[in-house]
From Swiss-Prot:
SNARE required for protein transport between the ER and the Golgi complex. This is Protein transport protein BOS1. InterPro entries: GOSR2/Membrin/Bos1. Belongs to the BOS1 family. The chain crosses the membrane at residues 206-226.
Length: 226
Protein backbone atom coordinates (compact mmCIF):
# COMPACT_ATOMS: atom_id res chain seq x y z
CA UNK A 1 0.00 0.00 0.00
CA UNK A 2 2.88 2.37 0.73
CA UNK A 3 4.35 1.83 -2.74
CA UNK A 4 1.16 2.80 -4.54
CA UNK A 5 0.71 5.78 -2.20
CA UNK A 6 4.19 7.04 -3.06
CA UNK A 7 3.36 6.60 -6.75
CA UNK A 8 0.23 8.72 -6.27
CA UNK A 9 2.28 11.44 -4.59
CA UNK A 10 4.66 11.55 -7.57
CA UNK A 11 1.80 11.67 -10.08
CA UNK A 12 0.10 14.46 -8.15
CA UNK A 13 3.31 16.50 -8.02
CA UNK A 14 3.90 16.01 -11.76
CA UNK A 15 0.32 17.07 -12.53
CA UNK A 16 0.62 20.23 -10.44
CA UNK A 17 3.92 21.11 -12.13
CA UNK A 18 2.44 20.76 -15.63
CA UNK A 19 -0.66 22.78 -14.70
CA UNK A 20 1.54 25.52 -13.27
CA UNK A 21 3.50 25.65 -16.53
CA UNK A 22 0.28 25.76 -18.54
CA UNK A 23 -1.23 28.52 -16.38
CA UNK A 24 1.90 30.66 -16.79
CA UNK A 25 1.21 31.01 -20.52
CA UNK A 26 -2.08 29.41 -21.64
CA UNK A 27 -1.99 30.94 -25.12
CA UNK A 28 1.63 30.05 -25.87
CA UNK A 29 1.85 26.65 -24.19
CA UNK A 30 2.62 23.78 -26.62
CA UNK A 31 -0.09 21.28 -27.48
CA UNK A 32 2.13 18.47 -26.22
CA UNK A 33 1.79 19.89 -22.72
CA UNK A 34 -1.99 19.56 -22.86
CA UNK A 35 -1.65 15.96 -24.03
CA UNK A 36 0.77 15.25 -21.21
CA UNK A 37 -1.63 16.72 -18.64
CA UNK A 38 -4.54 14.65 -19.99
CA UNK A 39 -2.45 11.47 -19.89
CA UNK A 40 -1.27 12.19 -16.35
CA UNK A 41 -4.83 12.76 -15.12
CA UNK A 42 -5.98 9.51 -16.73
CA UNK A 43 -3.12 7.55 -15.18
CA UNK A 44 -3.72 9.28 -11.84
CA UNK A 45 -7.40 8.26 -11.92
CA UNK A 46 -6.54 4.62 -12.68
CA UNK A 47 -3.99 4.51 -9.88
CA UNK A 48 -6.65 5.87 -7.50
CA UNK A 49 -8.98 3.04 -8.54
CA UNK A 50 -6.24 0.50 -7.84
CA UNK A 51 -5.55 2.16 -4.50
CA UNK A 52 -9.26 1.95 -3.64
CA UNK A 53 -9.30 -1.79 -4.37
CA UNK A 54 -6.30 -2.34 -2.11
CA UNK A 55 -7.97 -0.33 0.66
CA UNK A 56 -11.10 -2.49 0.47
CA UNK A 57 -8.95 -5.58 1.09
CA UNK A 58 -7.24 -4.06 4.14
CA UNK A 59 -8.31 -5.69 7.44
CA UNK A 60 -6.52 -3.32 9.82
CA UNK A 61 -9.13 -0.72 10.77
CA UNK A 62 -6.65 2.03 11.62
CA UNK A 63 -4.65 1.61 8.40
CA UNK A 64 -7.84 1.43 6.37
CA UNK A 65 -9.23 4.69 7.79
CA UNK A 66 -5.92 6.46 7.20
CA UNK A 67 -5.74 5.21 3.62
CA UNK A 68 -9.36 6.21 2.96
CA UNK A 69 -8.60 9.75 4.13
CA UNK A 70 -5.63 9.89 1.76
CA UNK A 71 -7.76 8.55 -1.08
CA UNK A 72 -10.43 11.21 -0.50
CA UNK A 73 -7.77 13.94 -0.51
CA UNK A 74 -6.24 12.66 -3.75
CA UNK A 75 -9.65 12.47 -5.45
CA UNK A 76 -10.41 16.03 -4.39
CA UNK A 77 -7.09 17.25 -5.78
CA UNK A 78 -7.73 15.41 -9.05
CA UNK A 79 -11.15 17.06 -9.34
CA UNK A 80 -9.57 20.49 -8.74
CA UNK A 81 -6.90 19.75 -11.35
CA UNK A 82 -9.52 18.79 -13.94
CA UNK A 83 -11.46 21.98 -13.24
CA UNK A 84 -8.32 24.11 -13.54
CA UNK A 85 -7.30 22.36 -16.77
CA UNK A 86 -10.74 22.97 -18.24
CA UNK A 87 -10.59 26.68 -17.35
CA UNK A 88 -7.10 27.02 -18.84
CA UNK A 89 -8.20 25.40 -22.09
CA UNK A 90 -11.19 27.75 -22.25
CA UNK A 91 -8.90 30.74 -21.71
CA UNK A 92 -6.60 29.50 -24.48
CA UNK A 93 -9.52 29.07 -26.88
CA UNK A 94 -10.81 32.57 -26.13
CA UNK A 95 -7.34 34.02 -26.69
CA UNK A 96 -6.98 32.16 -29.99
CA UNK A 97 -10.42 33.32 -31.13
CA UNK A 98 -9.55 36.90 -30.26
CA UNK A 99 -6.28 36.69 -32.21
CA UNK A 100 -8.13 35.24 -35.21
CA UNK A 101 -10.60 38.10 -35.18
CA UNK A 102 -7.78 40.63 -34.92
CA UNK A 103 -5.92 39.04 -37.82
CA UNK A 104 -9.08 38.90 -39.90
CA UNK A 105 -10.47 42.38 -39.28
CA UNK A 106 -7.47 44.28 -37.99
CA UNK A 107 -6.02 45.30 -41.37
CA UNK A 108 -7.92 47.81 -43.52
CA UNK A 109 -7.46 46.83 -47.18
CA UNK A 110 -8.82 50.21 -48.34
CA UNK A 111 -6.20 52.35 -46.65
CA UNK A 112 -3.65 52.08 -49.42
CA UNK A 113 -6.35 52.45 -52.09
CA UNK A 114 -7.46 55.73 -50.57
CA UNK A 115 -3.92 57.01 -50.50
CA UNK A 116 -3.52 56.07 -54.15
CA UNK A 117 -6.78 57.81 -55.03
CA UNK A 118 -5.56 60.97 -53.31
CA UNK A 119 -2.27 60.81 -55.19
CA UNK A 120 -3.65 59.52 -58.48
CA UNK A 121 -2.40 62.63 -60.30
CA UNK A 122 1.21 61.79 -59.46
CA UNK A 123 2.54 59.64 -62.34
CA UNK A 124 4.93 57.45 -60.33
CA UNK A 125 4.23 53.93 -61.54
CA UNK A 126 7.09 52.19 -59.67
CA UNK A 127 5.80 53.41 -56.30
CA UNK A 128 2.35 52.01 -57.08
CA UNK A 129 3.90 48.67 -58.01
CA UNK A 130 5.99 48.53 -54.82
CA UNK A 131 2.98 49.29 -52.65
CA UNK A 132 0.95 46.61 -54.39
CA UNK A 133 3.65 44.01 -53.83
CA UNK A 134 3.99 44.97 -50.18
CA UNK A 135 0.25 44.75 -49.69
CA UNK A 136 0.19 41.33 -51.36
CA UNK A 137 2.96 40.06 -49.10
CA UNK A 138 1.14 41.34 -46.04
CA UNK A 139 -2.06 39.63 -47.09
CA UNK A 140 -0.20 36.41 -47.81
CA UNK A 141 1.46 36.51 -44.40
CA UNK A 142 -1.88 37.24 -42.76
CA UNK A 143 -3.44 34.27 -44.56
CA UNK A 144 -0.62 31.99 -43.42
CA UNK A 145 -1.06 33.18 -39.85
CA UNK A 146 -4.78 32.50 -40.02
CA UNK A 147 -4.17 29.01 -41.38
CA UNK A 148 -1.70 28.30 -38.59
CA UNK A 149 -4.11 29.56 -35.95
CA UNK A 150 -6.93 27.50 -37.41
CA UNK A 151 -4.73 24.41 -37.32
CA UNK A 152 -3.90 25.12 -33.68
CA UNK A 153 -7.61 25.51 -33.00
CA UNK A 154 -8.36 22.17 -34.67
CA UNK A 155 -5.60 20.50 -32.68
CA UNK A 156 -6.97 21.97 -29.46
CA UNK A 157 -10.44 20.71 -30.28
CA UNK A 158 -8.98 17.27 -30.98
CA UNK A 159 -7.13 17.30 -27.67
CA UNK A 160 -10.31 18.38 -25.88
CA UNK A 161 -12.23 15.54 -27.53
CA UNK A 162 -9.44 13.12 -26.57
CA UNK A 163 -9.61 14.31 -22.97
CA UNK A 164 -13.38 13.84 -22.92
CA UNK A 165 -13.02 10.35 -24.37
CA UNK A 166 -10.44 9.49 -21.73
CA UNK A 167 -12.78 10.70 -18.99
CA UNK A 168 -15.63 8.65 -20.45
CA UNK A 169 -13.29 5.66 -20.67
CA UNK A 170 -12.46 6.05 -16.97
CA UNK A 171 -16.17 6.22 -16.12
CA UNK A 172 -16.92 3.12 -18.19
CA UNK A 173 -13.95 1.32 -16.65
CA UNK A 174 -15.16 2.14 -13.14
CA UNK A 175 -18.70 1.07 -14.01
CA UNK A 176 -17.41 -2.18 -15.49
CA UNK A 177 -15.50 -2.95 -12.30
CA UNK A 178 -18.61 -2.37 -10.22
CA UNK A 179 -20.66 -4.59 -12.52
CA UNK A 180 -18.05 -7.36 -12.34
CA UNK A 181 -18.00 -7.05 -8.56
CA UNK A 182 -21.79 -7.34 -8.41
CA UNK A 183 -21.70 -10.28 -10.83
CA UNK A 184 -19.08 -12.03 -8.71
CA UNK A 185 -21.18 -11.43 -5.61
CA UNK A 186 -24.29 -12.80 -7.33
CA UNK A 187 -22.32 -15.77 -8.62
CA UNK A 188 -21.11 -16.59 -5.11
CA UNK A 189 -24.65 -16.29 -3.75
CA UNK A 190 -26.01 -18.64 -6.40
CA UNK A 191 -23.33 -21.20 -5.65
CA UNK A 192 -24.12 -20.95 -1.96
CA UNK A 193 -27.84 -21.38 -2.62
CA UNK A 194 -27.19 -24.41 -4.83
CA UNK A 195 -25.00 -25.97 -2.14
CA UNK A 196 -27.65 -25.39 0.54
CA UNK A 197 -30.38 -26.85 -1.67
CA UNK A 198 -28.23 -29.87 -2.44
CA UNK A 199 -27.54 -30.41 1.26
CA UNK A 200 -31.24 -30.05 2.02
CA UNK A 201 -32.13 -32.71 -0.54
CA UNK A 202 -29.53 -35.03 0.97
CA UNK A 203 -30.94 -34.44 4.44
CA UNK A 204 -34.44 -35.22 3.16
CA UNK A 205 -33.20 -38.49 1.69
CA UNK A 206 -31.61 -39.49 4.99
CA UNK A 207 -34.75 -38.49 6.87
CA UNK A 208 -37.18 -40.41 4.69
CA UNK A 209 -34.75 -43.31 4.45
CA UNK A 210 -34.58 -43.40 8.23
CA UNK A 211 -38.38 -43.44 8.46
CA UNK A 212 -38.63 -46.32 6.00
CA UNK A 213 -35.91 -48.26 7.84
CA UNK A 214 -37.67 -47.67 11.18
CA UNK A 215 -41.04 -48.88 9.79
CA UNK A 216 -39.39 -51.98 8.37
CA UNK A 217 -37.75 -52.67 11.73
CA UNK A 218 -41.09 -52.24 13.54
CA UNK A 219 -42.72 -54.61 11.06
CA UNK A 220 -40.18 -57.37 11.62
CA UNK A 221 -40.18 -56.82 15.40
CA UNK A 222 -43.96 -57.09 15.56
CA UNK A 223 -43.89 -60.10 13.24
CA UNK A 224 -41.17 -61.78 15.31
CA UNK A 225 -42.94 -61.33 18.65
CA UNK A 226 -46.33 -62.17 17.31
Amino acid sequence: MNAIHNHLVKQNASLKKDLSEFSANPAGAPMSLQGQISATMTSFSRTLDDYSEIINKEHNKEKKEKAEARLARFREELADARSEFKNLRSAREEKTLEENKTALFGDNPYGESRNRNVNRDVPIQPTYTDLTREEGMQREQSSLNQVGQQLDSFIEQGMAALGDLQEQSDILRSTGKKMRSVAETLGLSRETIKMVEKRARQDKRFFYGGIVFMLVCFYYILKWFS
